[in-house]
């Protein structure tokens, strides 16, 4: 059922994209500007850094990343996008995975994708897929349960697929994050951590060419079962100057409740001249060709109780709240 849901969400981004007629119309001047752009002049490698504060199942992090065109044609591009992030400890008393504090780690993410423009360049469509990893170091808990001396590291991984459609007014993004390998691991004597399957659809509107507001729906599911259910999210992003984008996010689901996070992305390179970079910044449909794909984190949650105590380094099962031997 979940796999069918993910396929449906991915198809919806392409199916819904042609609906907004206002973005299709455009003025003759707008169409002339976009048709005159040579993609080989503006679709160039970019590299830089990014950072984010913790959200629903995602860590405090900062790192480097880059977008690398593999092949650029008149109206399309094949690309590779890669990220490496260092993770930092959770805010005191505020676990990013619900109960256990994340003490650090790092992550990697790669996406291979294809993006193309329609005939009059009023829409950009894209498909990408990739692989993400997330080793985790753990600390204490926010629940008062003493786990000192039993903290463990864990390693989670996932495959991801994404479909996108962008005009100069609207953007649609559908995605599926699917954990693979050992998706459920012990974090300490009491809590287990699990990577979440996540399937979502975001719909955004460009208030201006550099300000985008979006809302989204997601469904999450994990082997532990404690975080299963639906959620909603909102995002406001502002490209302050070419290559520098800041965003604020708010999400809600029953497991993580309300989470507010923020992120910053800086990229250097891109279009050949300053004038071209400014022109591209005012045309979201062209700017999207070199944008970094979203939804790159392996989302993790935890759960505890008598049902998980048997995995206790060979010790006897413990009652809820008991300390280790």
Mark where each language-model region is.
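Residues on the lipid-exposed face of transmembrane beta-strands in outer-membrane beta-barrel proteins
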Residues: 64-68, 110-114, 161-167, 201-205, ...
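Extracellular loop and loop/strand-boundary signature of outer-membrane beta-barrel proteins
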Residues: 50-53, 88-100, 140-151, 184-193, ...
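Flexible, glycine-rich linker and terminal segments associated
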Residues: 24-35, 185-195, 200, 205, ...
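Residues that define the transmembrane beta-barrel architecture of outer-membrane proteins
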Residues: 58-64, 102-108, 123, 155-159, ...
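Detector for outer-membrane/organellar transmembrane beta-barrel domains
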Residues: 148-224
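Repeated loop/turn-to-beta-strand initiation elements of outer-membrane beta-barrel proteins
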Residues: 73-80, 119-127, 169-174, 209-215, ...
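Transmembrane beta-strands of outer-membrane beta-barrel pores
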Residues: 51-57, 70, 84-90, 116, ...
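Short glycine/proline- and aromatic-enriched beta-strand/turn motifs that initiate or cap beta-hairpins
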Residues: 21-81, 85-94, 307-323
């Amino acid at each position: 059922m979940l796999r069918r849901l993910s396929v449906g969400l991915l198809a919806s981004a392409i199916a819904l994209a042609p609906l907004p007629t206002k973005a299709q119309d455009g003025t003759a001047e707008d169409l002339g500007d976009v048709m005159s752009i040579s993609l080989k002049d503006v679709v160039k490698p970019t590299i830089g850094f990014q950072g984010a504060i913790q959200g629903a199942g995602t860590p405090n992090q900062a790192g480097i990343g880059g977008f690398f065109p593999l092949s650029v044609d008149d109206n399309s591009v094949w690309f590779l996008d890669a990220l490496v992030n260092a993770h930092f400890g959770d805010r005191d008393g505020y676990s990013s995975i619900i109960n256990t504090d994340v003490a650090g780690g790092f992550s990697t993410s790669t996406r291979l994708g294809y993006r193309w423009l329609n005939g009059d360049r009023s829409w950009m469509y894209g498909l990408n897929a990739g692989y993400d990893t997330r080793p985790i170091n753990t600390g204490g808990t926010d629940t008062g349960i003493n786990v000192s001396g039993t903290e463990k590291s864990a390693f989670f991984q996932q495959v991801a697929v994404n479909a996108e459609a962008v005009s100069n007014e609207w953007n649609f993004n559908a995605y599926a994050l699917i954990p693979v390998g050992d998706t459920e691991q012990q974090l300490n004597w009491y809590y287990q951590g699990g990577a979440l399957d996540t399937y979502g659809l975001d719909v955004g509107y460009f208030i201006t060419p550099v300000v985008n507001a979006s809302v989204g729906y997601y469904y999450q599911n994990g082997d532990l079962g404690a975080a299963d259910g639906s959620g909603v999210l909102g995002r406001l992003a502002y490209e302050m100057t070419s290559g520098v984008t800041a965003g604020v996010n708010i999400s809600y689901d029953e497991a993580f409740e309300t989470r507010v996070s923020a992120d910053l992305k800086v990229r250097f390179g891109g279009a050949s001249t300053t004038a071209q970079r400014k022109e591209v910044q005012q045309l979201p449909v062209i700017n999207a060709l070199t944008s970094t794909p979203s939804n790159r984190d392996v989302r993790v949650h935890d759960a505890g109780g008598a049902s998980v105590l048997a995995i206790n380094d060979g010790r006897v099962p413990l009652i809820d709240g008991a300390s280790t031997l």
